[in-house]
C-alpha cells in the first residue's frame, strides 16, 4: 500500500494513447489492495504553448485516455478503482517531493530516465519503447476533423462548471482539470444542493454537500498548486453563472450541455456578456476507439451508488 508514480515524457499529448494498456495493467494490480494511490506525471512541452482550441482537444483526449485507463480493477468493482491524479509538468506547479517522501514504485518512459534519478522510491521500472510499440501505434488512431478556428487563441480567464460531484470519479476529474485549464484567473464550481437531487437514483447513498464540496476543492488544489478556486453550493440550475459578470466560460458535459442555452438566455436578459461554452466529450478516446485491451470500467456516480446499495443489502 502507498503511492505509485507513472512518469511519462511526451513530445505530443496525443502520444498518451501509447500508455493505455500499461496504465490499465498497473491500476489493476494496485486495485487488489486497499490504500493504494496512483499519480501520473506527464512531461510535455505542449502545455507551455498558448491555449488554442486545438490544444484544448488534445488535452481533453489525453485526460480521457489517462483517467479512463486508470479506472481498471482486478475485481470489476467501481469501489476498487484506485484514486488517481494526473499532473502536468509546466502547468501543475506541483513538486513531486511535496506529494510523498518516498514512492512505493516509479514506472517511467525510457526518455525520462534522467528526470527520475533523484526521485526517492523503493523500486523503479522502465516502460521502454519496445513495450510501448506493442501497446498502440499512434499512427493508427483516427484523426479528428480540425475546424477552421482550431488555431484560434483562447483568452478565457474565469471559468465555471456545475454538477453533483457525488463520489468524485475519473469523469469528474477530467471535467474539473479542463475547467482549471480555462480558468487562469479563477475557477468557480457549483455543487448541487439537496433540493436539486430529489430525483437521483439511490439518493440515500449520496454524499452530503460538505463532503462533495471538500472533495472538489481538494482535487483542484492537488492538480494545480497556485489555483484560485471557489466551490459553492447551488440551489438552482444557474448558480453564479447568471449573476457574476466576470465569468467568461462555462464548461459542460454531454449530460449538462442543454442547460448552457438557458444560462446564455438568462445572462442576455440581465445584460451580462455571453459565455464561451466548451463541451467535454468524456467518451473519447478510450471508449470511442473500442480498444480490445482496454478494460476500464464505465464509471458514473449512479453506478457507484447502485453498487453501494447492493453491498448494503448483501450485508444486512
From Swiss-Prot:
Any one GO molecular-function label of the UniProt entry: dephospho-CoA kinase activity
Lineage: Eukaryota, Fungi, Dikarya, Ascomycota, Taphrinomycotina
Similarity-based family: To yeast YGR277c.
Gene3D superfamilies: HUPs
SUPFAM superfamilies, sorted: Nucleotidylyl transferase
InterPro entries: Cyt_trans-like, Rossmann-like_a/b/a_fold
Highest taxon listed in the record's lineage: Eukaryota
Protein name: Uncharacterized protein C1F12.08
GO cellular component terms, A-Z: cytosol; nucleus
GO BP: coenzyme A biosynthetic process
Amino acid at each position: 500500500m502507498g503511492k505509485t508514480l507513472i512518469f511519462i515524457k511526451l513530445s505530443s499529448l496525443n502520444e498518451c494513447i501509447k500508455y493505455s494498456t500499461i496504465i490499465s495493467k498497473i491500476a489493476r494490480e494496485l486495485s487488489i489492495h486497499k490504500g493504494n494511490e496512483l499519480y501520473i506525471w506527464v512531461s510535455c512541452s505542449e502545455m507551455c504553448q498558448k491555449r488554442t482550441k486545438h490544444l484544448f482537444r488534445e488535452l481533453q483526449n489525453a485526460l480521457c485516455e489517462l483517467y479512463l485507463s486508470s479506472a481498471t480493477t482486478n475485481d470489476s468493482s467501481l469501489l476498487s478503482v484506485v484514486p488517481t491524479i494526473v499532473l502536468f509538468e509546466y502547468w501543475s506547479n506541483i513538486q513531486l517531493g511535496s506529494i510523498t517522501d518516498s514512492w512505493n514504485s516509479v514506472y517511467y518512459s525510457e526518455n525520462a530516465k534522467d528526470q527520475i534519478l533523484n526521485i526517492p522510491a523503493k523500486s523503479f521500472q522502465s516502460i521502454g519503447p519496445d513495450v510501448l510499440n506493442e501497446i498502440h501505434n499512434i499512427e493508427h488512431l483516427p484523426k479528428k476533423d480540425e475546424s477552421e478556428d482550431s488555431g484560434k487563441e483562447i483568452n478565457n480567464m474565469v471559468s465555471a462548471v456545475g454538477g453533483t460531484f457525488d463520489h468524485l470519479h475519473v469523469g469528474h476529474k477530467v471535467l474539473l482539470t479542463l475547467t482549471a485549464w480555462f480558468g487562469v484567473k479563477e475557477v468557480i464550481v457549483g455543487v448541487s444542493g439537496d433540493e436539486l437531487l430529489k430525483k437521483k437514483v439511490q439518493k440515500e447513498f449520496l454524499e452530503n454537500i460538505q463532503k462533495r464540496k471538500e472533495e472538489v476543492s481538494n482535487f483542484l488544489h492537488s492538480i494545480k498548486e497556485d489555483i484560485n478556486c471557489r466551490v459553492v453550493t447551488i440551489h438552482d440550475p444557474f448558480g453564479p453563472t447568471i449573476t457574476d459578470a466576470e465569468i467568461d466560460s462555462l464548461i459542460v458535459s454531454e449530460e449538462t450541455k442543454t442547460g448552457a442555452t438557458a444560462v446564455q438566455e438568462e445572462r442576455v436578459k440581465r445584460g451580462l456578456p455571453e459565455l464561451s461554452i466548451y463541451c467535454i466529450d468524456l467518451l473519447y478516446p478510450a471508449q470511442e476507439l473500442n480498444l480490445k485491451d482496454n478494460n476500464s470500467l464505465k464509471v458514473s456516480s449512479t453506478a457507484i451508488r447502485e453498487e453501494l446499495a447492493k453491498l448494503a443489502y448483501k450485508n444486512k
